[in-house]
């Protein structure tokens, strides 16, 4: 259900609908709810390679007199800098050895700037950036950000996070979805007061907005990252990096691709799939697949939710270095195990990676047990909140509802929410 929020003095109040929400959901004292941010936002991204500075955009020629520019740079120009409504983001590949204690700041508030000898306004690193938890920034990146900050609007900032291996080309699109807060409010009051992280506050206007609350009390998939033991309204400092590819099906929301009560609603264009569906204990998903050097994660095969509709594309594969998308069937090559898997890798050797407990089952049809064949099409069916395979189904009813799809074809399947027991 929806409630109305009111922003007052840096805090939010659920001014309407809170009491009804508590009554309808049976929310008990001490249980948590999910605050689902529906406000559209886009965050621009700058990609750095493993050397952290070899792909820095070129400093505009008007500032050539600045002698502190990085030594190595390419001819990539800076354009489409964000406005005050769209914060910026920098993806920096860092290591624990380069930790800097002064590389973090928690505020979006403009800090008074200083002036250099030429009278131009400059902004410090802390005035330009705020870092995700456990994120370190190297001196050359700090220096570079301080330089390009002179060309940004004053309300623009970089949100600095870390990624695993570089699995995207420079010209690919990367989206950032911010995980919304876990809240615990008093169920006996008529209103619920809470605060949001400072970088989210910038996306809200000083008006009453309609938002969505979901309860996590009845989640079928317990998820340790909900951190139910932490204090109420404490920020969960996590981000979701999403790789996007060109798609004939632009969709509004990437939804329900992960565990219950951890839905992602990020406005975007083009089909995509977020990396946070990988198991939280996986430190480097690309290395877990096959070294991470010759695989583009979901570069050739793409999938994503379009509201309550699933859109899936299967691309043909022609070469040992081309990625493919497959997943183990409950009856093919997995000993009948009743767990979903999503797999990405290159042919031969079964170099696939999967996850348990997600909402999607997807795999390529295969004649041999335990192997996905190159170029085979994908056939899926969404039934009862799951995606089932196009072949080898024991139920004639399910098998009759889908047909073969040519490799590269797009199709949409209506999603049915699972019935509550």
Curated annotation (Swiss-Prot):
Localization, UniProt: Nucleus
Principal localisation: nucleus
Disulphide linkage map: none
GO molecular function terms listed in the Swiss-Prot or TrEMBL record: DNA binding
InterPro entries the record matches: B3_DNA-bd (IPR003340), DNA-bd_pseudobarrel_sf (IPR015300)
Keyword Transcription regulation: yes
DNA-binding region: 1-51
KW Repeat (keyword) present: no
Record keywords, A-Z: DNA-binding, Nucleus, Transcription, Transcription regulation
GO cellular component: nucleus
Superkingdom, natural source: Eukaryota
Species, as recorded: Oryza sativa subsp. japonica (Rice)
UniProt feature, compositional bias: Basic and acidic residues: 95-107
Biased composition (Polar residues): 108-121
Region: Disordered, residue numbers: 92-121
Protein known as: Putative B3 domain-containing protein Os08g0333500
């Amino acid at each position: 259900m929806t409630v109305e929020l009111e922003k007052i003095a840096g805090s939010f109040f659920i001014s309407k609908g809170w009491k009804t929400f508590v009554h309808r959901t049976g929310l008990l004292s001490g249980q948590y709810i999910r605050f689902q941010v529906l406000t559209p936002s886009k965050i621009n991204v700058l990609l750095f390679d493993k050397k952290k500075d070899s792909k820095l955009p070129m400093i505009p020629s008007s500032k050539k007199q600045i002698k502190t520019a990085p030594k190595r740079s390419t001819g990539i120009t800076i354009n489409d800098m964000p406005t005050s409504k769209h914060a910026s983001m920098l993806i920096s590949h860092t290591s624990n050895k380069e930790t800097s204690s002064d590389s973090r700041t928690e505020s979006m508030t403009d800090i008074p700037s200083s002036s250099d000898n030429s009278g131009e306004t400059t902004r410090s690193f802390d005035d330009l950036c705020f870092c995700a938890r456990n994120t370190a920034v190297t001196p050359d990146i700090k220096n570079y950000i301080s330089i390009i900050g002179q060309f940004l609007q004053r309300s623009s900032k970089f949100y600095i996070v870390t990624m695993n291996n570089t699995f995207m080309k420079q010209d690919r699109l990367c989206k950032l979805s911010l995980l919304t807060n876990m809240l615990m409010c008093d169920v006996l009051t008529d209103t619920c007061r809470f605060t949001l992280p400072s970088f989210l506050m910038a996306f809200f206007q000083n008006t009453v907005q309609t938002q969505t609350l979901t309860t996590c009390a009845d989640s079928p998939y317990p998820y340790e990252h909900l951190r139910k033991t932490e204090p109420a309204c404490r920020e969960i400092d996590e981000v979701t990096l999403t790789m996007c590819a060109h798609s004939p099906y632009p969709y509004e929301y990437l939804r329900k691709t992960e565990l219950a009560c951890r839905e992602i609603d990020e406005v975007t264009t083009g089909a995509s799939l977020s990396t946070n569906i990988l198991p939280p204990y996986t430190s480097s998903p690309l290395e877990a697949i096959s070294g991470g050097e010759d695989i583009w994660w979901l570069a050739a095969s793409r999938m994503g939710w379009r509201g309550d509709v699933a859109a899936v594309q299967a691309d043909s594969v022609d070469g040992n270095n081309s990625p493919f998308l497959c997943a183990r069937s409950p009856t093919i090559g997995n000993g009948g195990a009743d767990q979903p898997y999503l797999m990405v890798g290159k042919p031969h050797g079964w170099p696939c990676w999967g996850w348990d407990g997600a909402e999607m089952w997807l795999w390529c049809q295969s004649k041999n047990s335990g192997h996905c064949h190159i170029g085979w099409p994908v056939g899926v069916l969404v039934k009862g909140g799951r995606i089932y395979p196009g072949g080898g189904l024991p139920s004639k009813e399910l098998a009759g509802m889908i047909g073969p799809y040519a490799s590269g074809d797009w199709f949409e399947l209506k999603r049915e929410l699972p019935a509550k027991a």
